[in-house]
Regions:
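Short acidic, glycine/serine/threonine-rich loops at helix termini
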Residues: 8-9, 60-65, 115-119, 127-128, ...
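Gly/Ser/Thr-rich active-site cleft segment
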Residues: 9-10, 15-85
Length: 287
């Protein structure tokens, strides 16, 4: 994953960035390949390469960094590119700008992340990659710490195995052996009560995390936005919405705007609306 920077928007790909990604300096994630692949094309065609709103955009307010244990800090990890793109779109639909709006954005995919977007900044997140918040189709979300620590010791797991477990082999996959919501909903339609139970449990936990983000925004919320691939599921949308409609209006934007967001971010640089940031000069927070 990209390092945690206090700046956001678009970065020019440089050698320091490529080195950090190739050596997995901060973490292992498929998105690490983005800048590396972009650089291959950039060198071939003699043009600059950029990244836009990487998954570790860090705009956290100071209190949001506190974990509860000295020496461990909360990290800002979420689907920032899609969250911010969809938030801009919904703000436009409401006749406002992103910088004038307050949103809770819920990205529903194999991983689930939530962001509290306050006047153009993602001031707090529910970081599903590191084991916060709801369980997802393939991630654990928050776990009982003592029981999990005991289980790690008993199974003699390495840190690499733990990461793969909580971010790839947990959630619905561990309960049902399935991550595809279409298949799970077909099982439910056929009368599978176990599948129904765990899908509802996931939606219950997502709704709880939405409530958490509502507190961050002190109840001043223009909309709760549900996006990502799982937002195509009417079952998931309804299960979540019925629990949180009292907080703010629900806006559903299924799928992702990530390709359009990449274009729009770089276009803002090329037209002079924004200036590309220099990764090597950015403030980096170490692990």
């Amino acid at each position: 994953l990209f390092p945690y920077t206090t700046l956001f928007r678009s970065y020019l790909v440089d050698q320091q960035m490529l080195e950090d990604l190739r050596t997995e300096r901060f973490n292992t994630h498929a998105s690490n390949l983005g800048a590396i692949l972009a650089n291959e094309f950039a060198e071939k065609y003699h043009v600059p390469a950029f990244i836009v709103d990487p998954v570790v955009v860090d705009e956290l307010q100071p209190l949001a960094r506190i974990s509860g244990l000295k020496g461990i800090h909360r990290r800002s990890v979420g689907h920032a590119l899609n969250q911010k793109a969809v938030a801009r779109k919904i703000a436009e639909d409401l006749g406002k700008t992103y910088e004038q709006s307050n949103f809770i954005v819920v990205h529903l995919g194999g991983g689930i992340s939530l962001g509290a977007h306050q006047k153009g900044r993602m001031v707090d997140v529910v970081n599903g990659l590191d084991g916060e918040g709801p369980y997802t189709p393939e991630r654990s979300g928050a776990l009982p710490l003592v029981e999990f620590a005991q289980w790690i010791l008993e199974q003699e797991l390495t840190i690499s195995q733990v990461k793969k477990l909580i971010a790839g082999n947990s959630g619905l996959k561990s309960y049902l052996g399935e991550t595809d919501l279409r298949h799970i909903q077909a099982q439910i339609a056929a009368g599978d009560q176990t599948a129904n139970y765990y899908l509802k449990g996931m939606c219950y936990q997502i709704a709880k995390s939405i409530g958490e983000m509502a507190v961050v925004l002190e109840g001043t919320i223009d909309a709760i936005i549900l996006t990502g691939g799982a937002a195509y599921s009417q079952t998931v949308v309804q299960e979540i919405s019925q629990k949180v409609t009292w907080i703010a209006p629900i806006k559903v934007y299924p799928g992702e705007m990530e390709m359009a967001a990449l274009y729009e971010g770089v276009n803002r640089v090329l037209t002079g609306e924004e200036q590309a940031l220099n990764y090597s000069e950015a403030k980096i927070e170490q692990e």
